[in-house]
Amino acid sequence: YFYFEKVKRFGDVPWYDQPLKSDNPDLYKARDSREFVMSKILEDIDYAIAKLPQEQNVYSVTQWTALALKSRICLFEGTFRKYHGIAGHEEYLDECIKAAERFIDESPYLIYKGSSTPYRDLFSSNNAISTEVILARDYEIGLNIIHNANNYTLSNTYGMPGLNKKIVDS
């Protein structure tokens, strides 16, 4: 996922497949091609799909989580290549379809229809609804495992007074 985000943002990036020490000259190597990095990403995700457990666990990465991620990665890369005139988009879109079809056909996930307000239940439940949610985080205030959703709804000053430029310059 780390490299996928880097490719989305920067395109060509250097690929490292082993830990490096701070004095390693490879830290300054040139960027690897997008094609090379994306092939390595798919190689890694295919390895994960083969090795991860199949059991459904909403709070842990499983084979189903990796398949969903592969579908998403391939959809992004395939459409990016198609609409930017880069060759090879068909292969990525085909891989996206294969991963999505396998997920739909073989995974234990279903659309949640457990109440009269299923959409609300997905987002207001204290625990993730394991029949539909693929991966979630279990927040527990007692263990100080919390989210930062308030950062998206509050101002940058978090309710404290903010200083304007005139006050700062005075």
What are these regions (language model features)?
Residues 1-64, 72-91:
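Aromatic-anchored glycine-rich loop motif in surface-exposed flexible loops
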